[in-house]
Amino acid sequence: MIVCIAEKPSVAKDIARIIGATTARDGYMEGNGYQVTWTFGHLCELKEPDDYTPMWKHWSLAALPMIPQRFGIKLINDEGIKKQFATIEKLMQAADSIINCGDAGQEGELIQRWVMQKAQAKCPVKRLWISSMTDEAIKQGFQELKDQGEYQSLYLAGLSRAIGDWILGMNATRLYTLKYGQNKQVLSIGRVQTPTLALIVNRQKEIDNFVSEPYWVLATIYRDTQFTATSGKFTSKEEGEKAFSTIAGKPFTVTDVSKKKGNEAPPHLYDLTSLQVDCNKKFAYSADITLKLIQSLYEKKYTTYPRVDTQFLTDDIYPKCPQILNGVSQAKIMSQQKYLPLIQQLATISKKLPKSKKVFDNSKVTDHHAIIPTGVPPTGLTDMEANVYDLIAKRFISVFYPDCKFSTTTVLGEVINEDGPKPEKIEFKVSGKEILEPGWRVVYAKDVKNADDDDASDNANGNADSGNGAKKEVVEERTLPSFTKGESGDHQPTLTEKWTTPPKYYTEATLLRAMETAGKFVEDEELRAALKENGIGRPSSRAGIIETLFKRHYIRRQRKNLMATPTGIELIDTIHEELLKSCELTGIWEKKLRDIEHKTYDPADFINGLKEQINKIVIDVLSDNSNRRVTIMTEEDLKKKPAAKKPAARKASAKKMPAKKKDEATAQNVDTQNAAAQPVSAPQAPADPMVGKPCPLCGKGVIIKGKTAYGCSNWKSGCQYRQPFSQML
C-alpha cells in the first residue's frame, strides 16, 4: 500500500479524488492502492526545556544558557492531534512506500519530515512537488514524483531555522524576563521579531526627535509654466530673498530644450511580499489577512503557490500561458467579465505572446515561480478574495503587453542680472512627461493609480522635504508648451517658505519592504532583488511576525500607521546586544539559512555560531548592574487614555515657526498624542455592528465576537478569519 500524507484535510481530499482513493476511513481516504491521510499543519514541535531536564522547568538565570546536547521532537499536546497521529503512525508502519504531499516549501518539508520521524517510518519516500492545486498539476506531479533525498537540504535549512529560533528565543526570553521584567510578565525575544520591532521603534524615535527646519524654494512662472531654480533650496531667508531680488524685473531666457524618448516596462509579477505590500496600500489589508486570502485562492485552485520570493516564471510555463489567459478571460469579478477586453486587445497587438527575460528566467526561480492565475475561472469569491485575484490577474495580463512609450521634455532657462559689477545668473528647469503609447498601462487605465504609482510616491524613508537623502526624480506626466531655445520674456518669480518634515511612520507595506531588504530602503527593483538575499524572515513568516508584535502589545495600529507601545520602546532600549535587534546581522543569519538550503553552508556551523552568540549575550546581560525594568502593557493599559503631552522635539520645532505654523504644529502634536492614546477597541455598544456581517474571508460564515478578537462562525470548517480588537482602529 502507498501512503500519501498531505498538510491539511482539504488538500488530502483533492489528491485522493485524483488518484482514486474514494473510500472514507477514520482519518484517511483509501482506494486504488493508496491511503491518503493528513496533518493539521504542525503535529510535532521541538521539545520544551523541561523535556530535556527537570532543572530547566523553573525559570532561573543560573540555568542559562539552556543548550541540549541533542534536540528532539514531540507531539503537540492536543487530543485531536494525538488521535490523527495514531492513524498516521499505523498507516506508515504498514506502508510499502510513502509519498510526501506536504506544502512544497521549507516549512511544509519540516512538518512532514517530523511526522515521519515520529512515526518511525522505514519505507522509501517520494516527494510530490507542485506549484498549483489544479487537477492537471496534481496529475502531472504524480507522474513526476521526486526522490525525497533531493529535498534534504531544504529540510536541513528548516531544521536549522527551528533550532536556531529555539536557542535564541528560549534563552533570550527567559534572560530578559528574569533580568528586566516585572509582575511576572514575559518579555518575548525572537530572532526576527525583535529586529522588526527595533525598526518600528527607531523610526518612531526619529519622528519624535525630529526638529522641523524652514527652507525656501525659488521658482518662477514663464508662459504659464513653473520653472524651479536648479540651485536647490535655500536654508536662510536672506539667501532666498537675495536670489529673488537678483531676478526680479529681469527677462527670463530659454537656454535649452531637449526631448528624450524612453520605455517603461510592465511591473514584475507578484511574489508574496509585493502582493502583501499592494494589498496594504490599496485595500488596507494586513499582511496576515492577505496571506490567508491568497492561501484560500490557492486551495480553491484559482492561483498558484503563494509563499514565494521570486517574481519570475520558468520557461516551461510559457507554453501554458495562452491557456491561462483564456481561462482568466472567462473570469467574472464582481459580476463583470472585466479581463476579456484586455486579453482580446492583447491578441490584436501580437499573434504570439512575447517572451521576455523580465518575465521568464529560470535562473531567478528555485522552488516555485511567481504568483499567477491558474486559468481556472473563479466563482463565488468574497469581495476581499476578488480584490486579491484582480491584482494578480491584471499583473499577469500586463506583462504580455508592450512597454509604455513616453517622451520626456526638459526645458532649461536662466535669468541674468547685469546691474552689478559682476553679472549674476540663476538657472531654472522644468520637465514634463508625455505618454506616446500607453502599452501595458491600458490594463490599469480604469484604476485610480497605475500599478507602480504607489512605489514611486511612497518613500519609506520619508518624503522629499525630510532632508534624509536624495530621492529619484519623479517627472510629472504633463505636456509642456512648445518652447524655443533663445526665446525670452517677462516672468513672475516666487520665493516659497517650506518646512522639512519627518520620516513617515511605518505601515505594514513599508515595514514588509524594510524586512525584505534588511532595513535598507531602496526604490530600484533590481537592487531590491539583490538585497532580498539578506532580508529578515521568510516571505511566508513575515505576516506572522507582525501579528506576534501586536499580540505581545509591543506595537499597535493607528489608522494605517504602526506605532510602538511604551513596552516595545523600553524593550528595545534595554537590549544592548546588536545580534538581537540588528536587521543587518539578522539578515546575515537569514542568508546563511538560504545557503544551507543551497548546500553551500554547513548546518552545524550555523547552530554552533548561534550557541556562541547566546553564551556571549547571557554573560553580557548578567554583567549589567543597573536596575532597569521594562513596563509591561496589558490590554487594559492600552485602553486607558492618558493626558496628552507634547514631545520635547516638537516643541523645539514649533519655536522656530511663525505664529500660524506654530499653531498648526501644536494642533498636530495634540492630535498625534490623542490618537496614540485612543483605546484599542471602542466601548461595547449594545449591538456590535461587526457581528453578523458575512465573513470577508470565506463568505460562508458570519462574523462572531470572541474575548479578544472577531472570528468567523465557520471556524470549525477551517475558516481562519481573525481580526483582533487591538487592530480595529
Regions found by a protein language model. Name each.
Residues M1, I99-A104, N183-V186, K259-H268, ...:
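Conserved short loop/turn motifs at secondary-structure junctions
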Residues M1-W166, M170, V448-K449, K471:
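Intrinsically disordered, low-complexity regulatory segments
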Residues T23-Y28, Q148-S153, R174-L178, K205-F210, ...:
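Active-site phosphate-binding and catalytic loops of NTP-dependent enzymes
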Residues F71-I98, L199-I200, D278-C279, L391-I397, ...:
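Phosphate-interacting basic helix/loop segments used at nucleotide- and nucleic-acid interfaces
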Residues K237-Y270, Q276:
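Metal- or metallocofactor-binding catalytic centers and their adjacent structured scaffolds
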